[in-house]
Regions:
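Paired intracellular helix-loop junctions of major facilitator superfamily
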Residues: 79-89
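Glycine/proline-centered helix-kink
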Residues: 17, 103-111
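Symmetry-related core transmembrane helices of the 12-TM Major Facilitator Superfamily/SLC fold
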Residues: 122-139
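Glycine-rich segments within core transmembrane alpha-helices of 12-TM secondary carriers
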Residues: 93-106
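Alpha-helical transmembrane segments of multi-pass secondary-active solute transporters
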Residues: 2, 32, 91, 113, ...
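Interfacial helix-cap and linker-helix signal at transmembrane-aqueous boundaries
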Residues: 23-24, 109-118
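Intrinsic disorder in cytosolic terminal tails and internal cytosolic loops
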Residues: 140-148
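C-terminal transmembrane helical hairpin of 12-TM major facilitator-type secondary transporters
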Residues: 1, 7-13, 17-20, 24-81, ...
Length: 148
């Protein structure tokens, strides 16, 4: 059943990539990307509330997948709107390097938190981190740079 949840995150990510990517082309990628981050943060609250109930875990997987897929699809467009296309590869490289560092540090940190304080503490940490990140994203000024 756990493997099915992982697969569901991946399938929902496709929906997020295609759906939010297309919507971003119509309404603008920046605020929609910020919303996708908020959706990911809310997924951890759903996971925390699941208390082992599989149906709620399915909801968590779908919400996380859609939010994550939207973030992946909208990031390059948001960078282009905010910074223009000159140097876009460098900016995206820095952005994805930051994500890679999180991917490197996150799992051992989560493991240490779970080992010392329990599974729910690990989920709570993820919720707090994602929530703070969402707030920070919403406080950033949204300036548009002329295309070059």
């Amino acid at each position: 059943r756990a493997a099915a949840l992982i697969g569901l995150i991946g399938a929902s990510s496709i929906v997020g990539r295609l759906g939010l990517g297309a919507l971003g082309a119509k309404v603008g990628p920046i605020r929609l990307m910020q919303a996708a981050f908020g959706v990911m943060a809310s997924s951890y609250a759903i996971w925390l509330a699941a208390d082992g109930r599989y149906g709620v875990l399915v909801l968590f997987a779908v919400v996380l997948g859609v939010g994550y897929g939207g973030f992946i699809a909208l990031s390059p467009a948001a960078v282009a709107v905010m910074f223009g296309t000159n140097g876009m590869a460098t900016i995206l490289g820095a952005t994805y390097t930051g994500a890679g560092i999180g991917g490197l540090i996150g799992p051992p940190l989560a493991g240490a938190i779970i080992d010392s304080s329990g599974f729910n503490a690990g989920i709570t940490y993820a919720l707090i981190t994602a929530g703070v990140s969402t707030v920070v994203l919403y406080t950033l000024p949204v300036a548009r740079v002329a295309q070059t």
